């Protein structure tokens, strides 16, 4: 019986040792698993934070790009509308009654004739300009109306064409026109 007791003691000791080793192994495995889960959570959290940051940056870029595109389209439309207004004004000047054209030419000639020796006009206004001015008629120019005055030797030219007057007024008034049209 002595041997059976020794064998039994060894078996119980071995079982106790196996149980202790299993318990330690389970504890160590649980600790490693928990650490791995924590590392995984941290990595996932970091990844999510990076993705959220990247999405926020991308969102901001898309919004900025969209805003720039809207501004570009708006400015192009405003320019197009202002160009249309300019074109309509040119057409209104071209089609104004002869009496009004004569009145405007008379005003320009009376006011500025002393500044020149020769006068130019459009072909359509030639007869009226010859009638209203005492200056030498020097020829026709390509314009919608008005006159150009020139000194004797041609070194000084004063442009009082409707084209240049309209262009100057248009450029000076561009901001004001834009404010009126677009509030």
UniProtKB/Swiss-Prot annotation:
Give the UniProt subcellular location, in the record's own words. Answer: Cell membrane
Task: Name the Gene Ontology molecular function terms of this record.
Answer: ATP binding; proton-transporting ATP synthase activity, rotational mechanism; proton-transporting ATPase activity, rotational mechanism
- State the protein's name: A-type ATP synthase subunit E
Looking up InterPro entries in the UniProt record yields: ATPase_E_C, ATPase_V1_Esu
Could you tell me the membrane topology recorded for this protein?
Peripheral membrane protein
State the similarity comment. Answer: Belongs to the V-ATPase E subunit family.
Q: What does this protein do?
A: Component of the A-type ATP synthase that produces ATP from ADP in the presence of a proton gradient across the membrane.
State the organism named in the record: Methanosarcina acetivorans (strain ATCC 35395 / DSM 2834 / JCM 12185 / C2A)
Q: Which GO terms describe its cellular component?
A: plasma membrane; proton-transporting two-sector ATPase complex, catalytic domain
Domain of life, per UniProt, equals: Archaea
Give any single GO term for biological process: proton motive force-driven plasma membrane ATP synthesis
Describe its partners and assembly state. Answer: Has multiple subunits with at least A(3), B(3), C, D, E, F, H, I and proteolipid K(x).
| Alphabetic keyword roster | ATP synthesis, Cell membrane, Hydrogen ion transport, Ion transport, Membrane, Transport
């Amino acid at each position: 019986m002595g041997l059976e007791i020794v064998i039994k003691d060894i078996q119980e000791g071995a079982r106790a040792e196996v149980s202790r080793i299993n318990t330690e192994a389970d504890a160590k495995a649980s600790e490693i698993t928990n650490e791995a889960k924590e590392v995984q959570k941290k990595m996932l959290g970091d990844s999510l934070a990076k993705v959220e940051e990247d999405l926020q940056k991308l969102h901001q870029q898309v919004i900025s790009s969209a805003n720039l595109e809207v501004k570009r389209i708006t400015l192009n439309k405003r320019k197009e509308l202002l160009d249309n207004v300019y074109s309509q004004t040119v057409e209104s000047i071209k089609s104004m009654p002869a009496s009004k054209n004569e009145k405007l030419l008379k005003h320009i000639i009376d006011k500025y004739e002393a500044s020149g020796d020769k006068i130019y006009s459009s072909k359509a206004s030639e007869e009226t300009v010859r009638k209203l001015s005492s200056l030498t008629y020097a020829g026709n120019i390509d314009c919608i109306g008005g006159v150009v005055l020139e000194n004797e030797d041609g070194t000084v030219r004063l442009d009082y064409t409707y084209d240049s007057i309209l262009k100057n007024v248009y450029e000076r008034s561009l901001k004001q026109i834009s404010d009126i049209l677009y509030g």
